Amino acid sequence: MTYEESEKNKNGLSSYIKKEGSSDLKVRVRFREPKLLVTHSGHITEQPKYEHLEQYLDSYVSLEDGDHDPKEAKELVFREVQLRHRINEFRKKGYFTAEAPVELKKAPSSNNIPISYRDNLLSHVNGYARSMHNDRKVRASRSRRISGMILAHFKRLSGADEKKAKEEDKRIRLLAKRTAWEIRKKWKVIEREVRRRRAERAAEAQRVAGKEQLANILKHSTDLLEARIERANINISAQTSESAVDWNYLLKTSDDLLSVDELKLKYSNPDLIKNIEREEEAEETSDDEPLSSEDEENEDEDITEESNLRKRKVSDKTRVVNKHPPSLRRSRRFFAKKSYNHVSDLDGEVIVMKKEDITDGVSTKKDLNDGDQNEVPLHDTGSSSSLSLLYNEDVASKKKRRVNDDGLARKKSIAGISEQRKFDEPNGSPVLHANKIQVPFLFRGTLREYQQYGLEWLTALHDSNTNGILADEMGLGKTIQTIALLAHLACEKENWGPHLIIVPTSVMLNWEMEFKKFLPGFKILTYYGNPQERKEKRSGWYKPDTWHVCITSYQLVLQDHQPFRRKKWQYMILDEAHNIKNFRSQRWQSLLNFNAEHRLLLTGTPLQNNLVELWSLLYFLMPAGVTQNNSAFANLKDFQDWFSKPMDRLIEEGQDMNPEAMNTVAKLHRVLRPYLLRRLKTEVEKQMPAKYEHVVYCQLSKRQRFLYDDFINRARTREILASGNFMSIINCLMQLRKVCNHPNLHEERPIVTSFALRRSAIADLEIKDLLVRKRLLHEEPMTKLDLSTLRLIRTDSEAFDTFVSDELNSLCATNAYNRISTFLRMQIDEECKPCQFKKSNFKEHFQNKIYQEQLDKLNFQKYLNESKCSHSPIYGSNLIRLAEKLPKHSTSIDYTLYAKDDPLYLLNTTKALRSCILSTEERASNMKEIIQRFACITPKAVVVDLPELFCKTIPRDLLYEVSRKINPLHQASTRLAIAFPDKRLLQYDCGKLQVLDRLLKDLVSNGHRVLIFTQMTKVLDILEQFLNIHGHRYLRLDGATKIEQRQILTERFNNDDKIPVFILSTRSGGLGINLTGADTVIFYDSDWNPQLDAQAQDRSHRIGQTRDVHIYRLISEYTVESNMLRRANQKRMLDKIVIQGGEFTTEWFRKADVLDLFDLDDESLKKVKADSDSGSTKNEENWEVALAAAEDEEDVQAAQVARKESALEQTEFSETSTPQAMLTKDSTPLSSDSATPGFERDSTEEQSNTNDMDEDRSELEEDLDETVGHIDEYMISFLEQEGTSDEW
């Protein structure tokens, strides 16, 4: 029976059993194993080498180095046993220890060799020969020594006299040399003494010459003032002659209707009034006849003309207000504190007067303590010149003239008025001058009273051929006064130019607009652009009347100085002229050589650092000298000796105003008064709104205080401060200022990220596990598993209908399978043993095996039946089709109207299911707020190579494409990977921003508009973030803003009230812009130069402002900023003594006071500070270089732009000295003897020579212990007559 037949019988048996359900049938089955079919020799099995496993295992022996044959193994074991046995023996003997004895084999002994007689003889001969050789050497050596001693003895005897002669000659030569050296030293000492005496005589002569030059300068200043007074007197005398005064009008008019001057004239001479009254009475009695009609008409015309003339001339002298110059009033107030009888006259001289010396015409109530009053009205007294006697008795006496008796009283009155005019200065009150200049008809504007006086002052300068400085405070209209001057020259003098106006780059457009507005009749050339454009503008450069005014910048005039230098200018006007304060700079040297008839300097701060800068301006005005006799204004050394050094001592040492200091101040005023006009806004513009300054102290935040204390307490910082290195100290100061402004400027808040590891630890550890995991991932075992069979895929049944699924469940035959399986289990004998090849149990065992196989097959069929019949979908295809057939939402009008009438129609559509199913993007959007608030935990470390380890089977192209897709979880993953600092910490990390927040809320809510100034560009970025956080609208202006954009931003801020804040850089927003739309100025930090802050605040507090201006200065408490503010207040002391706007000297503040900005307690640091006080200090150039090195790159660039435009451009206005090779022969007072006599050496050379003389004097005192005797006097007189060694 074959295998197929047996299978058929089995199937038939099974079916029969199912049908009959009987088990009595017995079947005997015999199986025969078929023979293998051999088709190849390889199919024949070989005979086994070993019969069984034990024989195979006994065929080899496994050792450490591999498997061996049993015989080889025995030999190896035997050798190993012998080796270990020897090792044990050596160990017992101690050979393996360090103390083991080492036994050396002895050399074979030669005792067995016999010694013969000949050997003894030869050894004796060798010993005797060695002994004789040694004796011979000893005797030869002894003989050489003896012979040498004998030769030396006889040589000494033969050369004794010659040696003695040589020694004597050597001694004489040495003595002569020393004597000559002493004589030469003595002559050098005498020569130094002669030079010292010559230097003293030269210094005395120079001092005398300097006094004479100062006297000449003072005399010239006095002459200029007297010349102006004479011209004013002539005009007044011509206008107030006897014929011009209508005494009838004065007598008949009530005193209430007359002005002060008319009352003065009316009651100045009672005798003249009585004579006029008597003449009128005589005329009334004599003139009784009536006049003809023609005579009446002529008389009416004469009366009308006389009345008009009287009104015009009376209006010219209606009121005379006594206004003294600001410097004079400040001096008077200062002197009044010391003594009541110290008075300053117009020329600044101090006159000590007694009370009884003052004329009786002056009221006793007019005491000198009234010097603080701005107006001194003329009193109704018998002599109007008494007030001038109060100020200057000598000047008043000089002005008395001989007049006839009839006009004595009237001329006394006129002289009093003219003398009083000598002390008048404009201050904004209505002043009408006798020689008032009419506004030119070309000028399209209106001048205020003080501007009218400024025009008259400028005109007087031009008429006297004198150059001057218009130093009005910023915002008083220096530009419009200059334009009016040029219009006056064109109208009255027929002088149409050409005029050159040099201005900072930032205000070029402003000057052009002012000219077009107020003087449209002039042709204006605005010189700017690239080199090609400037070349085109120079076409017709030397043709007359091509244009009248050329406006250019400091930078361009230096670049194209050749064409400007060759052209002849009528007026050269420099705006912001304090930028030529350094006479060593190339800018000063170039502009000095320009061919200009007149020069005018416009500046709001004539003094910024020291009086040397003022000398630079004055010398620039008068390079040819104040008079024809003098070749220059004054050399620098003399000017410093006259004014600078006394003022420095006065300010630095805090001395009181003694008579010597008062005299120095008065002389300085006399020198400056003819050339300088200075008015303050508070003095000339009474309607100007008030200005209030507030200092707001801000506490440092916790982070600021930590960074500040940490930096100042570092060992490195203490070393730098103790070393005294200027650049390093400035750098430390800048770092502390950054901490005070905002801690992020010093140290940014870190952005926390996870530490990224390129290689994970799992890549190096558990290699076997990693290989297995890689193999499984590579083979993709999930593809070999039928998950649907295991019913793990629940969505495979969604294609079934729910009704079909129910039918399939009803066809499940689980119960039938259970009955058959129960029957088969009953037939199986569990206790049946395996077949033992016996006929008795083979049948039972075979039958039991058949039943077991049938049972297993039945169970498998049961499982398949249940699996196939139990497929039930989650939703079913019928439900899905129903959902797809639901009506969609309609947006038509009919649907909307119908739904309005029948709300139930809206039930056909629903968004409930749609809202339950959210996409990844929608879920990320809904959880955005939660993610932003709570996704804040950043892991300490992440591994980069994990995706590569577990995604080897994914192609790289696919990974790249997936990475380019927009990841909705990118924000969440980023927040978990990177922790950014909260933006609100920007405010809470800084004490100034917290104060600024409260301040802005109050100001903006009350309708104020704010200007915020800062020095650092990075602070502007922080302020922008701060304003954006709080939602304030703002504008920004810094050094990078173009000139055209500045004007647009300025006009937009002034015209748009919806922009409450304007943030600016002090170095760019402090010049050339008008921001009167703001009434509040906030200085976030203070600049190094207080004048820049003053310029910045005057952008708002100027003419045109209608509201009071409040200035807030934010200062960090207990920091270097507090010390800087204290120093700035001390620097403003000089303003009260010289002129408004002065400061301390640079040498006093620059280096020595830098250490004062730190709160130093250590003794070492105090010692360094004392050394720096005694040593030389840094000049302004080193100061600026140090600041440039310490500041940030953006701030350095902004500073360069600031210097370029007078606080806008560092490149142009940095005080760099000009190399000597660049200076022309006549371009500098340092290089031309004819230009500046006595100026051959600058201050540095003078100081070095002085130091040399001091050293010579000290050496002289050391060399000469005794006093100078008659021989010394003879030597001194000889050298004085014959000259020193360098003169031979």
Swiss-Prot record:
One of its GO terms (molecular function) is ATP binding. GO terms for cellular component: nucleus; Swr1 complex. Signal peptide: none annotated. A motif (DEAH box) lies at residues 575-578. It is an enzyme of class 3 (hydrolase). PANTHER family: HELICASE SRCAP, HELICASE SRCAP-RELATED. Residues 105-177 form the HSA domain. Keywords: Activator, ATP-binding, Chromatin regulator, DNA-binding, Helicase, Hydrolase, Nucleotide-binding, Nucleus, Transcription, Transcription regulation. Coiled coil: none annotated. Residues 278-305, 1252-1266 have a biased composition (Acidic residues). This is Helicase swr1. It is found in: Nucleus. Its EC number is 3.6.4.12. PROSITE patterns: HELICASE_ATP_BIND_1 (PS51192), HELICASE_CTER (PS51194), HSA (PS51204). Component of the SWR1 chromatin-remodeling complex. Pfam families: Helicase_C, HSA, SNF2-rel_dom. It catalyses: ATP + H2O = ADP + phosphate + H(+). Residues 995-1150 form the Helicase C-terminal domain. Residues 275-326, 362-384, 1204-1288 are annotated as: Disordered. Residues 1208-1235 have a biased composition (Polar residues). CDD domains: DEXQc_SRCAP, SF2_C_SNF. Residues 459-624 form the Helicase ATP-binding domain. Catalytic component of the SWR1 complex which mediates the ATP-dependent exchange of histone H2A for the H2A variant HZT1 leading to transcriptional regulation of selected genes by chromatin remodeling. Belongs to the SNF2/RAD54 helicase family. SWR1 subfamily. GO terms for biological process: chromatin remodeling; transcription initiation-coupled chromatin remodeling.
